[in-house]
Amino acid sequence: MKVLMFGWEFPPHILGGLGTASYGITKGLAAQGDMDITLCLPNPHGDEDHSFLNIIPMNNVPVVWHDVNREYVEQRIGHRMSPDLYYDLRNHIYADFNYRYTDDLGCINFSGRYPDNLNEEINNYSIVAGVVARQQQFDIIHAHDWLTYPAGIHAKQVSGKPLVIHVHATDFDRSRGHVNPTVYGIEKDGMDHADCIMCVSETVINHYHQSPDKCFAVHNAVYPLEPGKEEIIAHRLPLKERKERVVTFLGRITMQKGPEYFVEAAALVLQRTRHIRFCMAGSGDMMNAMIELAARRGITDRFHFPGFMKGNQVYEAYCKSDVYVMPSVSEPFGISPLEAMQCGVPSIISKQSG
C-alpha cells in the first residue's frame, strides 16, 4: 500500500511530541513490510532518516513555473530533493499562483515551525499539497494533526483517495477550553472530510460530533531503547549515592501542560525541605511567566530552567531525576511519562492525562 502522508515536524528537528509521534508511526508502518510511505514536510533539513520512507520537502515543490536549468536546481535543492522530482512536480502545477510570493524556483517558503503567520503557512501548505497529490501515486492519505488537515482534504479532493486524519490533540486540550474558532473550524472540517479518524485516546473527539463508526483509538508508545540511550541509563547513580533529590518537568511550557502547578507544588515542598531541586526543561510561551513565578515564590535557588532538550539530552535529564511530574490540565496521551519509565524514573501525572 502506498501512503501519502502530511506532517509538520520530524526528527532530528522536533519542537514537541508531534515529531516524535510521527517518527514512531511511520517507522511502525514501514515495519509492516507492504507499506510505501511518502512523507511531506514543510521545511526538512535533509538530514532526516530516509531509510524507511520518502520525504518531499514542500518548500521545494514549485507552484509557479520558472525556466531553470538542471545544474542550478541540483545546486539549490539537490541535498533535499532530486531535480527529476522537481521537474515532474513542475509539470503538475494546476493553477496560476503568481500572486503568491515564491522564490527563484517558483516555490513557497515555509518556516517549518509555528510562526505568527501560521494560518497562512497552513493554507500555503494545502496549495502545495495539490501539486503533490496530482504528481504522486498513492492509495491512501494520512494527515497528522490540524496543521495538515487542509492539505489532506485537498489531496482527497484531487485524487478521490480515502483520507485518514490523526488527531494527536485538539484545541480543547491545548487551550483549556478557550478554543480558537479558526483552529476549531480547521479541526472540525478535517474530521468531517475524513474517512477514518485516528485518536490517541477516546476523549479527543467528544466536542466534534463525529460518528463513532469512523473513530479509532490508537495509543502512543515508545520504542525499545537504542544502545546509546541504554548506556546513558546504565550510568544512572543509585538513589543512596545522590546528595539531593531532583524532580523534573519536561515538555512544552504552555497552558495545556499546567506548568504553574509544578511551580506552586515546588514552592510547597520547599517549605518543608530544601534538599530538593526542581527542573523545568522545555520551552514555550509561558516560560518567562514561570521564571517570574518562581522568583515571586522565592525558590529560584532550587529551580532550574535548562531550556529545550532533544535526543540524548532528554534521557540524560531523566537519569538525573528521582521523580518525573506531568501536571497537564489536558493530555490526550503523553509520551514523556513512558520515556521516564523506560529510565526507571517514577512518574506522577494528572488524572486527566490519557
State each model region's role:
Residues 175-178, 222-238:
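Acidic anion/phosphate-binding donor-loop and adjacent secondary structure
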Residues 198, 240-266:
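Conserved donor-binding/catalytic core segment of Leloir-type glycosyltransferases
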